[in-house]
A protein has these predicted regions:
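Class I Rossmann-like S-adenosyl-L-methionine
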Residues: 1-242
């Protein structure tokens, strides 16, 4: 993120350090929004599955399978814990947009999941444990959400800030799934936006020093790359070294 904002600082020509710093932290907050939003997607998929079950039961002449469906997916213990998570609920309460706004996407993704061997094997298994339920979602996330071009386009349409964030945020979501512990209930900690105040201050310091000490750092780069023609080095590479 710091590299992106430093690069933009030089490219847009405004050279307003305070405004650029504000943009850095806004960009980081949007990445954290995406983290929460992707956690919400797993709940949305489960809610859609329940909706399908309810609609099938409400038919005039439902089949026995529709009246007595396999409830294993919608009663997944990991999702039951996630949907009452206090931190996630706080985030959701402040959001105007939910996955209900993109139900067509949720429907299409759910249908791909249902057609998969991962889903079929889970539903057919007699094992009923929190660990198996959590592992199901780790596999589903990695297979259907991690590298999903349709989802990438949808997210980019919602926020330009999410264009380059998803790949790294996906790793945070997978880490979160792995860390969930049943005994923590609704108080399971999610990953924080910053590890601590010192972590946030480090980002600010690194950003400011990269810009304020630009001349000195470029001199060092030049001194240590005498065999290079710096004018021919990609500007992004110069920013990274800086």
């Amino acid at each position: 993120k710091i590299i992106q904002i430093v690069y933009a600082y030089y490219q847009n020509g405004s050279k307003n350090l305070d405004a650029a710093e504000k943009e850095l932290f806004f960009s980081l907050s949007k990445a954290y929004d995406l983290y929460n939003y992707l956690l919400m997607l797993m709940i949305a998929l489960t809610n859609y599955a329940q909706k399908r079950i309810d609609a099938a039961k409400a038919k005039l002449a439902p089949t026995a399978e529709e009246l007595y469906p396999n409830m294993k997916f919608v009663e997944n213990k990991f999702i039951s814990q996630l949907e009452v998570n206090r931190q996630l609920m706080d985030f959701i309460s402040n959001q105007k947009r939910t996955w209900e706004n993109d139900e067509d996407f949720v429907k299409g993704l759910f249908e791909k999941i249902v057609a998969s061997d991962i889903y079929k094997e889970y539903m057919a298994s007699s094992e009923s444990s929190y660990e198996a339920d959590r592992e199901l979602w780790r596999k589903l996330y990695k297979t259907f959400i991690f590298n999903n071009e349709e989802l990438d386009i949808l997210l980019e349409d919602q926020s330009l800030y999410w264009n380059d964030d998803k790949e790294i945020v996906d790793t945070f979501v997978l880490k979160t799934i792995k860390r969930f512990d049943e005994k923590n209930g609704a108080n399971q900690p999610l990953l924080p936006e910053f590890k601590d105040d010192e972590d946030q201050e480090f980002a600010r310091r690194l950003f400011r020093r990269a810009i304020l000490n630009c001349d000195y750092y470029r001199h060092l780069i030049s001194e240590n790359t005498r065999n290079w023609d710096l004018d021919r080095v990609a500007f992004m590479d110069v920013v990274i070294m800086q």
